[in-house]
């Protein structure tokens, strides 16, 4: 090979933006690749966690209120649980009802539960 890595880097440093653009296109065509920027995989909520908008929410039943039977009926409707399981869930609050749902769905279900007297949190 006639050129070594240092010579290639020196040539790239001296090239104009248009020449570099042509080089990228030629490399893409020659080797069948694309020069797409790598996408970072979303990790845990580290330093940038506060800046990101939350997309998944948890619906937590905080209390049943005075109309426990109506709350149990709505909980059964939302979760698909049987009567016994829904009653246990309502009796042992705070308990999560649904996890990882969209904000719109969480707000809709919260309104439905608050309508029958339950206290609900969206986290």
From Swiss-Prot:
UniProt GO MF annotations: mRNA binding; structural constituent of ribosome
Keywords: Ribonucleoprotein, Ribosomal protein
Taxonomic superkingdom: Bacteria
A Pfam family reported for this protein in Swiss-Prot or TrEMBL: Ribosomal_L12
SUPFAM superfamilies found in the cross-reference section: ClpS-like, Ribosomal protein L7/12, oligomerisation (N-terminal) domain
GO cellular component, one term: cytosolic large ribosomal subunit
Residue intervals passing through the bilayer: none
GO biological process terms, semicolon-separated: translation
Oligomer status and interactors: Homodimer. Part of the ribosomal stalk of the 50S ribosomal subunit. Forms a multimeric L10(L12)X complex, where L10 forms an elongated spine to which 2 to 4 L12 dimers bind in a sequential fashion. Binds GTP-bound translation factors.
Family membership noted in the UniProt record: Belongs to the bacterial ribosomal protein bL12 family.
Entry function: Forms part of the ribosomal stalk which helps the ribosome interact with GTP-bound translation factors. Is thus essential for accurate translation.
Entry protein name: Large ribosomal subunit protein bL12
Organism, scientific name: Bacillus licheniformis (strain ATCC 14580 / DSM 13 / JCM 2505 / CCUG 7422 / NBRC 12200 / NCIMB 9375 / NCTC 10341 / NRRL NRS-1264 / Gibson 46)
